[in-house]
């Protein structure tokens, strides 16, 4: 079975657990560091319209709307999108990364910015999505990506791009169907961005006590 299909099947099976996890603020890394980090990075640019890709149950979209942005969310998992709509109204729709890469029309044709927050897991679909996103953005549009910091992998295993074994260890709920995910080195991220984007800034949010990096945020602008 293709990795992309396994990833989608896992998220569909775990949608209810994920919704409950986010609703109850059960991920310390997010509540302590990374949620604020991505919101602050976007707020510093303050785009008028923004597309939240891989929005899940919609927490980030809702937060950005409270800050005056016209935020919209898309996700491949229908159950997550339905939950987001129930909480916040019809600012969400179902769309997979392959559909976006194929040019699927959304509720708004162009956005000032897009954000992908801890939602780049596959190899090929990630590359195709990032390559295709300028078609959804205005000229000199912004792309914000928050993902696992490369040092998190470097500290545990060899520092090479490739598929890594995933798990739901550490989650408070009974998640199932762990999947492999694709890790990229910093060099490979830069190569992926180089054709369509300028790298404007890189942020490295750290844990307030351990001072270890919790994520990396790439702030990009289309060429």
Give residue spans per PLM region:
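Conserved S-adenosyl-L-methionine
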Residues: 198-208
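A short glycine-rich, Lys/Arg-flanked "PGG" loop and its adjoining helix->strand segment in the class I
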Residues: 127-142
